[in-house]
A protein has these predicted regions:
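C-terminal cap/substrate-recognition subdomain and adjoining C-terminal extension
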Residues: 24-31, 42, 47-49, 129-167, ...
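Preference for short coil/turn "hinge" residues that link or interrupt alpha-helices
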Residues: 12, 117-120, 179
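Sec-dependent N-terminal signal peptides
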Residues: 4-13
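Non-catalytic pre-domain segments flanking phosphatase-related domains
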Residues: 11, 17-54, 59-62, 69
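Conserved cytosolic headpiece of P-type ATPases
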Residues: 53-55, 61, 65, 73-79, ...
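A metal-dependent, Asp-based hydrolase signature
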Residues: 64, 70-154
Length: 295
């Protein structure tokens, strides 16, 4: 397969049937839009919203830590790339990147995710946010966007075309996931990641809460819905029963939506549901990506 050129422009232009996807994509699009139709029949100015995890849900792999398959690195994550390109005062060069990626971060994550996830953003302390953004946007344009799941992009674009407002809820640094805005065709204010305070254009170590992980994702979702006149959460997408299941469950068990409409939640490549979540979500497997993952 030929290398994609200008992959960002390619993805933004893909809508409806123009993007190959697994069979479940059409099913979930139809289900969500039928429920949107029910809501708008009685609330014409309703604002239907869909909420998406990012890593493993929209992109195959993890924007922060990358993707490794069968012992082969498919792409390096933004954390490693940021270190290698001088955006961290704490970790320098190949040695620093290896220390962070193979020791410090996985060790901390093994017993304290609530500390490990913010660390991915805090290592950027002292760098200019605009320079990090330029760098990360370029990574998406040149390579990361080719790892988007075809089905996820197709669903997201079809919902957006139909007037559903898509929001991102990610436990990766917001500086990383925000860089996907151009390739996904979403405005910047739809992205919610691990957020650090920016002081005079410079990244600080101060974390803003709640963290968009586990119950924090649900809290952010509810805040967005409450702040949107006639806003309704109609869909949720995730891939982890640990990180995402709470907000997915909220969407399908929330107080009744107008006119008998129901929320739809899709778990992607999540494996066997734990008993507490059995039967709640549409569980699917997907692997096809937009770009040249297979050669």
């Amino acid at each position: 397969m030929k290398k994609l050129v200008g992959v960002g422009l390619l993805i933004v232009g893909m809508v409806g049937g123009s993007l190959a996807a697994e069979s479940h994509a059409d099913q979930v699009i139809a289900t969500i839009l039928e429920n949107v139709r029910k809501i708008k029949a009685v609330v014409p100015d309703a604002v239907p919203m869909a909420f998406w995890d990012f890593d493993g849900t929209i992109i195959k792999g993890d924007v922060t830590t990358g993707l490794k398959e069968s012992g082969q690195v498919r792409y390096k994550g933004m954390a490693e790339l940021a270190i290698l390109n001088g955006f961290s005062p704490f970790y320098k060069g190949e040695k620093g990147a290896a220390e962070f990626m193979h020791h410090d971060y996985p060790h901390l994550r093994s017993f304290a995710r609530w500390l490990a996830y913010p660390l991915n953003a805090q290592i950027l302390c002292g760098s200019r946010a605009s320079k990090i953004d330029e760098f990360c946007v370029r990574q998406f344009d040149e390579s990361f966007a080719s790892w988007y799941f075809s089905s996820s992009v197709r669903i997201l674009r079809a919902l957006e075309e139909a007037g559903v407002v898509n929001h991102i809820l990610s436990a990766s640094p917001e500086l990383f996931v925000l860089a996907a805005r151009k390739t996904l065709g979403l405005p910047a204010d739809r992205f919610n990641g691990i957020r650090v305070a920016i002081d005079g254009g410079v990244v600080t170590e101060r974390i803003e809460y709640p963290l968009p992980s586990e119950g924090g994702k649900t809290e952010i979702l509810q805040r967005i819905v409450r702040s949107t006149p006639h806003g309704y959460a109609v869909a949720a997408f995730g891939n982890s029963y640990v990180i995402d299941a709470d907000f997915l469950r909220y969407v399908v068990t929330q107080p009744p939506l107008p006119n008998g409409a129901k929320g739809t939640s899709m778990m992607i490549n999540g494996g066997t549901p734990p008993p507490a979540f059995d039967g709640l979500f549409l569980c699917v497997e997907q692997d096809d990506v937009v770009g040249p993952a297979k050669k």
